[in-house]
Amino acid sequence: MIALIKRNLKIYFANKIGVLMSCLGALISFFIYIGFLQQNLISSWQSLPHTKEILDLWMISGIVAIAGITTSFQALGQLVKDRESRTWDDLSLTDLTPFQINCSYLTATIFISTLMQIITFFIMAVYFILVDSITIPTTALLPGLFFIVLGAIGASAVNLIIVSRAVLNYHFIAV
């Protein structure tokens, strides 16, 4: 099972363009916020104290969540490719049960999603610290990491259900 997890991680990170594309949803949201929405929202929420800091932290949390969803979905593309190319059938001939095979895809996806969310958080945090001079308390980093991992688990599990159902439905239609 560990070998299959390593395989899935190697395949995912070998495709540099695919890695970049999996973060594209989050990056597009980030650039839209910076370019178009930030000043509009700040002027609309003027009555609140520390408006810019509240909005920036809110955007960080929302966009990091988007990164978790999109990267986990992209990472599960390997499951679809393996089913399509019948690699899944070869894997089922090993001593791994279908549950263990699915768990290996899920574990690799959770790792990928967590890592990409951390990278997204880091990029956004550095930008907002440098440009908007916000402060992120160090006491918030550990709970934030917990929620990133929790979000990665949730997004990966939901996306695995969606992808598995779609693959099974396609398999029955194609046969």
Model-identified regions with their sequence ranges:
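Helix-capping/transition residues at the boundaries of transmembrane alpha-helices
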Residues: I11, L91-L93, V163-V167
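Hydrophobic alpha-helical transmembrane segments of multi-pass membrane transport proteins
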Residues: I28, L55-F128
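Perimembrane helix-loop junctions in membrane proteins
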Residues: L41-I42, Q78-S85, D132, S164, ...
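Alpha-helical transmembrane segments and their short interhelical loops
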Residues: P98, S104-V175
